[in-house]
């Protein structure tokens, strides 16, 4: 397997820790060169709830953060490995073989409609390079429209994994905040409040892939049975339970490329 150069992109407003940690560790362990990029060029910090091993998802009524995963995320956050990401606007897709988007609720704020990130993805698509997106970062693909496809989404006609609508934090009196683990005065994320999740990924993806595409929204996905889709050039994953499978699938596909 030849070593590849992989650009890994993350939000500055709250990753779901494992959705960055797992693909980061897996792609590095496979021997590839990784470069981290964020919108602001600041360390990507995890949502505090994503490093809380006692957190019980109130919708699916299950714990989502294994203690050993929380420990590893904190090691990376407290250490230096993620200290100096480049800005999206300073990255050039010509320097990389693959672009990997990671998830977290913050992705809906600063990745989904980010012009600089969209340009990187367009440049990847135009040069036939692998593009990955996990959980809420799939929204970046939804909102990226292609003039060569009559302004349809770049995922039109594709098979794409989507966070199930039945898992969304949606209901009366939700007040969701984006508190970060490891926040500092110059990297504190946002104090925005949203009434649950910002938007329903499943519905957006169904619309974006169109009648000839497939939205795979598997509400039964779990750590034992994760959900990842591969439809060149896209690798997409459902949510945090599929983070490891997402990283492994990217490594698997990279191994097939010259």
Which positions does each model-derived feature cover?
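Glycine- and acidic-residue-rich phosphate-binding/metal-coordinating active-site segment common to enzymes
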Residues: 130-131
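Short, thiol/selenol-centered motifs that function as redox-active sites or metal-ligating centers
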Residues: 134-138
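Extended, subdomain-level signal for the structured scaffold at the beginning of enzyme domains
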Residues: 1-127, 140-258
């Amino acid at each position: 397997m030849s070593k590849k150069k992989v650009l890994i992109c993350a939000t500055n407003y709250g990753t779901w820790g494992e959705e960055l940690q797992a693909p980061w560790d897996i792609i590095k362990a496979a021997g590839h060169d990784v470069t981290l990029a964020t919108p602001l060029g600041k360390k990507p910090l995890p949502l505090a709830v994503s490093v809380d091993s006692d957190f019980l998802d109130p919708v699916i009524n299950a714990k989502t953060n294994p203690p050993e995963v929380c420990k590893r995320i904190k090691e990376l956050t407290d250490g230096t490995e993620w200290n100096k990401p480049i800005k999206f606007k300073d990255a050039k897709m010509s320097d990389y073989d693959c672009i990997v988007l990671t998830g977290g609720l913050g992705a809906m704020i600063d990745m989904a409609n980010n012009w600089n990130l969209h340009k990187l993805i367009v440049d990847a698509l135009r040069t036939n390079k692998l593009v990955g997106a996990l959980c809420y970062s799939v929204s970046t693909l939804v909102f990226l429209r292609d003039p060569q496809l009559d302004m349809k989404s770049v995922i039109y006609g594709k098979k794409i994994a989507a966070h199930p609508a039945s898992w969304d934090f949606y209901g009366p009196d939700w007040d969701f905040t984006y508190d970060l683990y490891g926040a500092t005065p110059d990297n504190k994320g946002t104090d925005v409040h949203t009434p649950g999740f910002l938007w329903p990924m499943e519905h957006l993806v169904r619309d974006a892939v169109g009648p000839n595409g497939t939205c795979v929204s598997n509400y039964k996905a779990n750590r034992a049975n994760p959900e990842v889709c591969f439809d060149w050039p896209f690798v997409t994953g459902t949510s945090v339970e599929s983070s490891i499978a997402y990283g492994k699938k990217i490594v698997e596909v990279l191994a097939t490329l010259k």
